[in-house]
Amino acid sequence: MTLWSAEHAALATGGQAVGDWAVTGVSIDTRTLQTGDLFVALKAARDGHDFVANALAAGAGAALVSRVPDGVDDTAPLLIVPDVQAALEDLGR
């Protein structure tokens, strides 16, 4: 079941969706990512942007990012926002 489409996620966050995608879950960790999840590139002790390419290769439906990460094609399924944490909160509303 679709949790968010690219269009809905972009409207909810004010972000820019790249591509036409839909996601079925959410993950902040590539080790527990399920196929179809939205990978959220949070910045904490490590920068989640460093793991976006791996997440997409592992089957993430899209990634929530503040920039196109190194090693990720600019046509990859992304939701680009100014603030990843704030956008995640917006999606939760």
Task: Report the location of each language-model feature.
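N-terminal leader/targeting and accessory segments in enzymes
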Residues: 1-90
